[in-house]
Amino acid sequence: MLGIIGGSGLYNLPGIKVKEEVQVKTPFGEPSSPVVIAEVEGKKVAFLARHGRGHEYPPHLVPYRANLWALREVGVKRVLGISAVGGINELLMPGDFVVIHDYLDFTKTRRSTYYEGKFSVKVEGEDKVAKLLREGKVVHVDMSEAYCPEMRKVLIQILKEKNFRFHPKGVYACTEGPRFETPSEIKMLKLLGADVVGMTGYPEVALARELTMCYASLCVVANPAAGIAGYRLTSNEVIQLMKRKEEEIKEVVLKFIKELPEIRSCDCEKSLEGAEV
């Protein structure tokens, strides 16, 4: 099953049939929202609001571990994360889609792994994840190809067919937030190779990898980053841009649900092979 993490507006996809709403209790706390299980074109899909339905969770306090675990509990094997970002690369314009291929992590206070050695939370189950946690193993997952190539390929093809302005690659720099970045920080990120900057892309991608899930990130450039814009940044600007792009986002997501193959042909599910110490 596919899981989608984004805004609650995605629950209103054309043709969606909501089947149930599940309040999942996880060993890592409460997720930021109930998981909505729906059916689209005969396929089951799980939706989760990253910041909560009323946007109650700032980026540094989103319960990322609980969110990914909750999706795992309802049977999700693939996750599509949707988010707004600031543009660092001058080729990026407000409203552009970006299919992320790599990231830089500049977060500070977030719990970004399930595998904490002897301090790991012990869980029930006979799968590899549960066994590693019960045994208190230290795990180092490979992030050479952090985002699922199969999911990225489908997203890129859809964006081409829709003729939406998009970029097939992009490096996402994740900062702690909730404040916006300074112009000097953006200069630094640009020198390090970042194309976009956001506050929620990490640790979602790494946690999904630790759970052997596929993960892809579809970003929308909401505004130029600090120092590039030449004006004061506001949250309202981001909100208004995302509202204008809402229908296009829904079009992409709906087609993605339809066209994503049922059976995985990538290596994401092998992420724990050789990873334990």
Swiss-Prot record:
Q: Which CDD domains match?
A: MTAP_SsMTAPII_like_MTIP (cd09010)
Q: Which domain of life is it from?
A: Bacteria
Catalyzed chemical reaction(s): a purine D-ribonucleoside + phosphate = a purine nucleobase + alpha-D-ribose 1-phosphate
Q: Where does phosphate bind?
A: S8, R50, H51, S83, A84, T200
Q: Does the keyword Glycosyltransferase apply?
A: yes
Swiss-Prot/TrEMBL keywords:
Glycosyltransferase, Purine salvage, Transferase
> What's a Pfam family this protein contains?
PNP_UDP_1
Marked site, Important for substrate specificity, at E181, S235
Q: In which pathway does it act?
A: Purine metabolism; purine nucleoside salvage
The record's listing under InterPro entries reads: MTAP (IPR010044), Nucleoside_phosphorylase_d (IPR000845), Nucleoside_phosphorylase_sf (IPR035994), Purine_phosphorylase-2_CS (IPR018099)
**Which cellular component, as a GO term, is one annotated location?**
cytosol
Matches recorded under PROSITE patterns: PNP_MTAP_2
Q: Binding positions for substrate?
A: M199, N223, P224, A225
Q: Name one GO biological process term.
A: purine ribonucleoside salvage
Q: Which GO terms describe its molecular function?
A: S-methyl-5-thioadenosine phosphorylase activity
Q: What class of enzyme is it?
A: transferase
Reported EC number(s) for this entry are 2.4.2.1
Q: Which family does it belong to?
A: Belongs to the PNP/MTAP phosphorylase family. MTAP subfamily.
Subunit structure of this chain's protein:
Homohexamer. Dimer of a homotrimer.
> Additional info?
Although this enzyme belongs to the family of MTA phosphorylases based on sequence homology, it has been shown that conserved amino acid substitutions in the substrate binding pocket convert the substrate specificity of this enzyme from 6-aminopurines to 6-oxopurines.
Q: What does this protein do?
A: Purine nucleoside phosphorylase which is highly specific for 6-oxopurine nucleosides. Cleaves guanosine or inosine to respective bases and sugar-1-phosphate molecules. Involved in purine salvage.
Instruction: List the protein's name.
Output: Probable 6-oxopurine nucleoside phosphorylase
